[in-house]
Regions:
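Active-site pocket-lining segments that scaffold enzyme catalytic pockets across diverse folds
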Residues: 189, 193-253, 567, 578-596
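Extended, charge-enriched "interface" segments that sit outside catalytic cores
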Residues: 42-211, 228
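Active-site cores of enzymes that catalyze phosphoryl transfer or operate on phosphate-rich substrates
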Residues: 168-190, 261-322, 627, 754-816, ...
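Conserved phosphate-handling catalytic cores of large alpha/beta enzymes
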Residues: 374-385, 393-429, 433-439, 447
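Subset of Sec-pathway N-terminal targeting signals
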Residues: 1-39
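Alpha-helix capping and helix-loop boundary segments enriched in small/acidic/polar residues
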Residues: 5-8, 60, 203-210, 293-304, ...
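Flexible, glycine-rich loop/tail regions that form catalytic "lids" or insertion modules at the edges
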Residues: 67-74, 81-114, 188, 251, ...
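Cofactor-binding active-site loop characterized by glycine-rich and histidine/acidic residues
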Residues: 229-396, 400, 609-661
Length: 916
């Protein structure tokens, strides 16, 4: 419930406004005026703690009554939604004791008194009875509005004015009313048709929520005059087929084909997905001649997981359309379920992004399809709040609760919602109360768990039937008109089905084409070498930018020494360039070639380990300076953002961005790799499988700090094993690099092939500044990325008795041990890229070793983690012999908590690699 002014304001602010009000009541906001009038009324003379018995002066009586009138208006604006008729299944209006005559300070005899309120713009005089009726019509009919919690006065007053000045819905032109009926009938007839023709098949029908189509159509037709050119949509399974058919106008023939038992999508690769998860792109041409592009994102069954993906896609589309300042041309439109909106934490994460510099999209229209049930769960078991939408109050946006049985109200609020978004660049929420006519899916029996509710639903006419009856009774529709519409709907569906049957008869053994979707086809993965080196001139240009600041920039002395002067010295000496220096060189070289870069993550601008410093800050003003934005006039743009403290939503956002902007290098960095599992659903359902399921490739790069250095179980593992377990069909690339030059080349390689794949890099911690892992300038101006590297051998290959295979920083422990112990019969091979495995290169490197050579896999991670369980069967199959293991024992926890114990384990596993 909204807080009072007193609860949310400080005493100094109250005092300032009170003094202004005493001088001129009109000089303060009406809500303050009502507060002060009530305050003075409460301070009338008292006697012995009771109200004074003497009658107050006439002026005081008038002031008291007027204060109550103004309080009445304020009460309805604040609490009217609590008694609004928004539930289509409710038999009577909800009650709120705070809105009774008695609680508001009136009695029955006051109802016919003439009153007015300066709270209303027209200040029109009317009876108290008429005023209450007016307030109920505005705030407690089919629309329940929550907006008084918004502290931005202009925003709050804008909503207030739009609500109180909106025209009577019944004055809507006849042709508009007929168009609304058509939308409702199309939605209903589609579901009824599927229900009768494809009995028992899951379709997750929209029945009971058909007014969603009114909301969508209203927003669509309002887009061109509002300046919106494109809609990026996300929604779950409920009603998705109907939205595809009747809003995005996907071919009915294709939809019906997907219901066929013989349907197999003709995929270039991959496995496909069920019909109610597929994405879609279309351009709707409206009667006005205007066109609006609509993109519906493919989504998994993980409810709300698609939300940040859509936001990222929308931001990318805004960049493509050149709308990065105001962000009004591309509209994110998210459809939610009530149980999921309240229950899934990623909703709050996504809402929290809405006004952040690196993640804002100019406001999102949220539509909650509130069928008042989650599978079998009722609202009282699904949330602790009054409304499913209460979580949205944290970002202070308007929330409109709607009765889906009132399509005219749905239309009015939809127009208001888009106008609000365009005016303020903020989110807005439509909470459409409806019901679910059948079970969670069409094979489920809801009466098992909600018998009373479903008895009521069975008796309840559809919104199309109710609205048709209303139009017939008002004379806006004739019986012939209604019959003609019904015939038109049925004929359209029957013709599409007949077409499908004819095609199936002709091509019974052929695969149907996978088309009319968001699919993007690309060449297969290949390990061909890619030219990634840069020339010395380019290297110098980047270093010059990285070691230069404006004359008026007050650089912090320590930053000047450890960053600017250090970087210049490294360059002049020809190296060694440490890890993040190499990264900035890769970024800079791509920018000079016209490839933009986006990096986001927690503390990514400086780097968790204070080693990146991609953004410098003025020591006096705090103003940021990005050296890589000063390479040259024709360079591309680099965007580096410190993210909110979220993994799932931020990774989802950056993944969505990468989908629609493949020509940009998009990177997401976890603060520690251990935290990446906070985004596991984004990784599992989107990043590793989207190309197989939906033909949606992505080139996103995940940077996951990983390495065993005695920092305990929460700061050691990027969960390498989980990513390797997800590898198949060349779906992703997984790397564990050992030199800064390798990092440089792989980042450049990511943008220089004719295909894209997600890239997961286990980035180092202790190697970030280590000289032995740093590279010379020559390694950037020549060479390329190497999937597998050897080590300087200590003798002829045919004299080797042992080959130790490894990946990551344990390599350095192994070569140090070998040198220290003067071992001359053990070779070491390191996998820089663990997947896809470059088998040809590995075989070539192993050719010179005797067949009797002992093969050992060495890793820092426990035996049930790291690469062992992934790589061992592949090596055994490749070489036809057993592979010995050297590493930590299997463990439930990634690492020990004791530094001393860690060191003991590390020393033992390194020694074992030369003994097992």
């Amino acid at each position: 419930m909204p807080t009072s002014i007193a609860a949310r304001a400080n005493l100094e602010l109250i005092d300032q406004n009170y003094q202004r009000w005493q001088e001129d009541p009109a000089s303060v906001d009406p809500s303050w005026s009502a507060f002060f009038e009530g305050f003075e009324l409460g301070n009338l003379p008292q006697r012995n703690g009771a109200a004074a018995t003497a009658a107050p002066r006439a002026g005081v009586r008038e002031s008291s009554f007027q204060t109550r009138i103004d309080g009445l208006v304020y009460a309805y604006r604040t609490l009217g939604h609590t008694i609004a008729r928004v539930n289509p299944l409710a038999e009577k209006r909800p009650e709120n004791p705070s809105l009774t005559l008695r609680e508001l300070g009136f009695s029955e005899k006051d109802l016919d008194l003439r009153v007015s309120s300066k709270f209303f713009a027209d200040n029109e005089e009317m009876t108290l009875r008429e005023m209450i009726a007016r307030l109920q019509k505005i705030y407690a009919d089919s629309i329940g509005a929550e907006f008084m919690h918004i502290q931005n006065t202009r925003m709050r007053n804008w909503v207030l004015h739009r609500l109180e000045s909106r025209p009577d819905k019944h004055s809507t032109p006849r042709q508009v009313k007929i168009a609304l009926l058509r939308a409702l009938m199309e939605a209903e007839s589609f579901e009824v048709f599927l229900h009768s023709r494809y009995v028992g098949q899951k379709r997750f029908s929209i029945q009971g929520a058909e007014s969603l189509m009114v909301i969508l159509d209203t927003i669509l037709h309002k887009c061109p005059p509002a300046g919106v050119e494109e809609i990026c949509m996300g929604m779950s399974h409920r009603g998705r087929l109907n939205v595809l058919a009747n809003f995005l106008k996907k071919s009915l023939r294709v939809i019906f084909t997907e219901f066929s038992e013989n349907y197999i999508p003709e995929l270039v690769a991959g496995d496909g997905d069920v019909k109610y998860h597929l994405g879609y792109r279309t351009v709707r041409k409206l009667a006005s001649g205007a066109e609006v592009e609509i993109r519906l994102s493919a989504n998994p069954s993980h409810l709300e997981a698609v939300d940040p993906v859509v936001e990222g896609t929308a931001r990318a589309r805004q960049r493509i359309r050149g709308d990065t300042e105001h962000r009004r041309k591309v509209l994110p439109l998210l459809l939610h379920g009530d149980a999921a909106f309240a229950g899934q934490g990623i909703v709050a994460e996504t809402l929290n992004m809405s006004q952040l510099h690196g993640y804002g999209t100019g406001g999102t229209v949220h539509v909650v399809v509130n069928n008042q049930i989650g599978f079998t769960t009722l609202p009282e078991d699904a949330r602790s709040s009054m409304y499913a939408t209460d979580i949205a109050k944290m970002i202070e946006v308007p929330i409109f609760h709607l009765n889906s049985d009132d399509p005219l109200a749905c239309m009015q609020v939809s127009k208001l919602a888009l106008d609000f978004r365009q005016e303020f660049g903020r989110d807005i929420v439509i909470d459409m109360y409806c019901y679910r006519r059948y079970g969670h899916n069409e094979g489920d029996e809801p009466a098992f768990t909600q018998p009373d509710l479903y008895a009521k639903i069975d008796r309840h006419p559809s919104v199309a039937q109710l609205y048709k009856r209303e139009l017939l009774e008002s004379g806006a529709l004739t019986e012939d008109d209604a019959a003609s519409l019904e015939t038109e709907m049925d004929l359209r569906l029957e013709m599409a089905l007949d077409n499908v049957k004819a095609i199936e008869k002709e091509k019974i053994d052929k695969q149907a084409k996978f088309k009319e979707s968001t699919a993007v086809f690309q060449p297969e993965y290949k390990s061909s070498p890619v030219a990634t080196a840069i020339n010395e001139k380019t290297l110098k240009a980047i270093v010059d930018a990285l070691t230069r600041v404006p004359d008026d920039f007050n650089i912090q002395p320590k930053i000047k020494r450890i960053i600017i002067e250090h970087r210049r010295k490294v360059f002049e000496n020809g190296g060694p360039f440490e890890w993040h220096y190499a990264e900035l060189l890769a970024f800079g070289s791509l920018l000079l070639e016209g490839t933009p870069v986006r990096l986001s993550g927690q503390d990514s601008a400086r780097g968790t380990f204070s080693s990146r410093h991609a953004i410098l800050y003025d020591a006096k003003s705090g103003a940021p300076y990005v050296p890589l934005m000063h390479l040259g006039e024709k360079q591309a743009r680099i965007c580096i953002y410190n993210s909110l403290l979220s993994e799932a939503a931020v990774l989802g956002f950056d993944y969505g961005y990468s989908l629609d902007y493949p020509s940009m290098l998009c990177l997401w960095e976890a603060q520690f790799g251990d935290f990446a599992n906070g985004a596991q659903s984004i990784i599992d359902q989107f990043i590793v499988s989207a190309e197989s399921k939906w033909q949606r490739p992505s080139g996103i790069v995940l940077l996951l700090p990983h390495g065993y250095e005695g920092q305990g179980p929460e700061h050691s593992s990027g969960r390498l094993e989980r990513f390797l377990q997800l590898c198949a069909e060349d779906n992703i690339q997984v790397c564990n690099l050992t030199t800064s030059a390798q990092y440089f080349h792989i980042l450049r390689r990511q943008m220089k092939r004719d295909f894209i794949k997600p890239l997961v890099i286990m980035t180092p911690k202790s190697l970030l500044r280590a000289e032995f892992a740093s590279s010379s300038a020559k390694e950037f101006t020549s060479g390329k990325f190497e999937e597998i590297l050897g080590s300087p051998e200590v003798g002829p290959a045919d004299k080797m008795k042992r080959v130790i295979l490894c990946s990551g920083k344990v390599y350095y422990d192994l070569i140090n041990y070998r040198a220290e112990k003067k071992i001359d019969n053990a070779a070491i091979i390191r996998f820089e890229q663990l997947y896809p495995v470059h088998e040809t290169k590995l075989k070539s490197m192993m050719k010179g070793f005797p067949k009797t050579t002992q093969l050992v896999w060495c890793q820092e991670e426990p035996q049930n983690m790291g690469a062992w369980t992934f790589i061992e069967p592949r090596l055994r199959k490749l070489f036809g012999r057993e592979i010995a293991y050297a590493g930590r024992d299997a463990s439930a926890s990634p690492a020990v908590g004791s530094l001393a114990l860690h060191k003991r384990e590390q020393a033992a596993l390194v020694a074992d690699a030369f003994k097992v």
